[in-house]
Swiss-Prot record:
Zinc finger (C3H1-type): 110-138, 158-186, 204-232, 346-374, 392-420
PANTHER family documented for this protein: PROTEIN PHOSPHATASE RELATED, ZINC FINGER CCCH DOMAIN-CONTAINING PROTEIN 43
Subcellular location, record wording: Nucleus
UniProt keyword terms in alphabetical order: DNA-binding, Metal-binding, Nucleus, Repeat, Zinc, Zinc-finger
Region (Disordered): 1-106, 424-448
Protein name per Swiss-Prot or TrEMBL: Zinc finger CCCH domain-containing protein 43
Length: 448
């Protein structure tokens, strides 16, 4: 009898001693059976097909029957070994409900290794059977995929509870509906609209002051700006910003040292483009110091009260057209009303040349030079024209005055201002003659 384990492993079967008496024909049939078993094991190793196995088993059955049915157990053991080989192949990865077409592209299953991330995302792997990671079966892959989808949904739900800072700050979010954060405004959390200043900009006392508004007096964000926009009456800056409305129209400049009252607010006209205001003479009525509107007012005359400082400022025209007694009284009043801290005294610094010439300084309390208190506008020793500009026949003609009809240096200019400016109203007036009647009674316009 042949051992079944020896046939399955492909080793040569050893003859088994039998108790019954055998003849030479029995030994011959046993050797033939051993050769047939060896051939069958070789074919199973090389081919491994079920059909070949069945044919060989049928041959073995016929051989056993011809030999008197003594070795039928050996054929049964061969069939058992074939079934075990099929089970081994199924356990390697071809079983578990996979079809023959699916088994052609199976990736290696390595339970002890880490799952292939690319295979878990896409269901395929470019490395194929040479990949060193684990490739779970289809149902496991589907379970892992469902778990990841569930995790993403959970994460999205958590992010949806967080408010979108851009949506609540500006009232909109560039991501729109695709944003993962919350865009709903709770009814209980609706903030009241902030108060607006006279320019329509929000007042937010607890926030930082808008730097652009503090420099320019306007804000391009308007009511949606998150910074504070205080009224000009509460600003204490170091410079006089030029306030403009939201439409860009200039309203005026604000002086931080001016004295504001509840009934009126002092505003000054915007400065000249180059930083210095052109000289504008003024006219003063001798009754109670009230400004009188001259019928020949040409637009270059302004009030004697400086709206920027809120104090009385005498004009050169008034000083020239009045007596010395009235002039001294006016200057004493001007000295009394001018605030001491507007032009700082710095004895250790050189005197401000502009202040010493004109009695004024555009930098005011920010000027780093010395401004003596006893400095008053000196009476010019030369005559002035109708615009309050000096007449210096011994000097060259002021080119700025000859071109534009004004002079930004005023009475401190060192040149002559006796030339009639080209933009005079007298020279620009056209003489219109009445129509003349011709001899035939028709009117003529003078061109024919």
């Amino acid at each position: 009898m042949v051992n079944s384990e020896e046939i399955a492993d492909g080793f040569e079967p050893k003859p088994v001693s039998r108790s019954y008496s055998g003849d030479s024909s029995h030994d011959r049939s046993l050797s033939d059976l051993n050769h047939a078993a060896e051939d069958l094991s070789d074919k199973l190793k090389n081919v491994g097909l079920n059909e070949v196995t069945k044919e060989q088993s049928e041959k073995m059955m016929s051989v056993s029957e011809s030999n008197g049915g003594l070795d039928s157990n050996a054929v049964v053991t061969i069939n058992q070994e074939e079934e075990e080989e099929e089970e081994d192949r199924d356990g390697y990865g071809y079983g578990d409900g996979w079809s023959e077409n699916e088994s052609e592209n199976v990736y290696p299953v390595r339970p002890g290794a880490e799952d292939c991330s690319f295979y878990m995302r896409t269901g395929s792997c470019k490395f194929g059977s040479s990949c060193k990671f684990n490739h779970p079966l289809a149902r496991k892959f589907q379970i892992a995929r469902d778990n990841k989808v569930r995790e993403k949904e959970d994460d999205g739900g958590k992010l949806g509870l967080i408010d979108c800072k851009y949506y609540f700050r500006t009232g909109g979010c560039k991501y729109g509906e695709t944003c993962r954060f919350n865009h709903t405004i709770p009814k209980s959390g609706l903030a009241s609209a902030p108060e607006l200043n006279f320019l329509g900009l929000p007042l937010r006392p607890g926030e930082v002051e808008c730097p652009y508004y503090m420099r320019n007096g306007s804000c391009k964000y308007g009511a949606e700006c998150k910074f504070n926009h205080p009224d000009p009456t509460t600003i204490g800056g170091t410079d006089s910003p030029s306030f403009r409305g939201n439409n860009g129209v200039s309203i005026g400049t604000f002086s931080p040292k001016a004295t504001f009252q509840a009934s009126s607010t002092s505003w000054s006209s915007p400065r000249h483009v180059n930083g210095t205001s052109p000289f504008i003479p003024v006219m003063l009525s001798q009754t109670h110091g009230v400004t009188s509107q001259n019928p020949e007012w040409n637009g270059y005359q302004a009030s004697v009260y400086s709206s920027e400082r809120g104090v009385f400022s005498p004009s050169t025209t008034y000083l020239m057209n009045n007596s010395s007694a009235e002039t001294s009284m006016l200057l004493s009043q001007y000295r009394h009303q001018m605030p001491a801290e507007e032009f700082p005294e710095r004895p250790d610094q050189p005197e401000c040349s502009y202040y010493m010439k004109t009695g004024d300084c555009k930098f005011k309390f920010n000027c780093k030079y010395h401004h003596p208190k006893n400095r008053l506008p000196k009476l010019p020793p030369y005559a002035l024209n109708d615009k309050g500009l000096p007449l210096r026949p011994d000097q060259n003609i002021c080119t700025y005055y000859s071109r534009y009809g004004i002079c930004k240096f005023g009475p401190a200019c060192r040149f002559d201002h006796s030339v009639q400016p080209p933009y005079s109203t007298e020279s620009s007036q056209a003489i219109v003659e009445p129509p003349q009647v011709s001899a035939n009674g028709n009117e003529s316009d003078g061109w024919n």
